[in-house]
Amino acid sequence: MSKDDVIQMQGEVLENLPNATFRVKLENGHVVLGHISGKMRMHYIRILPGDKVTVELTPYDLTRARIVFRSK
């Protein structure tokens, strides 16, 4: 799978879960599980409930996502 195959969407963090995972509600109303991308972990980007985030979904599993950006 190449990087071009991902689906980018906007969402809002609903709640924190253990192991740096989050429940994210997407713009279209779906709720997915999201984990923080590696660069966000390296730079200690904090994500709290209510934050607007950009997530990447793969076409293979639309219930899990990678959080790649936190909007201000």
Swiss-Prot record:
One of its GO terms (cellular component) is cytosol. Disulfide bonds: none annotated. It is found in: Cytoplasm. Keywords: Cytoplasm, Initiation factor, Protein biosynthesis, RNA-binding, rRNA-binding. Pfam families: eIF-1a (PF01176). Residues 1-72 form the S1-like domain. The keyword Protein biosynthesis applies. One of its GO terms (molecular function) is ribosome binding. It comes from the Bacteria. Its main location: cytoplasm. Component of the 30S ribosomal translation pre-initiation complex which assembles on the 30S ribosome in the order IF-2 and IF-3, IF-1 and N-formylmethionyl-tRNA(fMet); mRNA recruitment can occur at any time during PIC assembly. One of the essential components for the initiation of protein synthesis. Stabilizes the binding of IF-2 and IF-3 on the 30S subunit to which N-formylmethionyl-tRNA(fMet) subsequently binds. Helps modulate mRNA selection, yielding the 30S pre-initiation complex (PIC). Upon addition of the 50S ribosomal subunit IF-1, IF-2 and IF-3 are released leaving the mature 70S translation initiation complex. Belongs to the IF-1 family. This is Translation initiation factor IF-1 1.
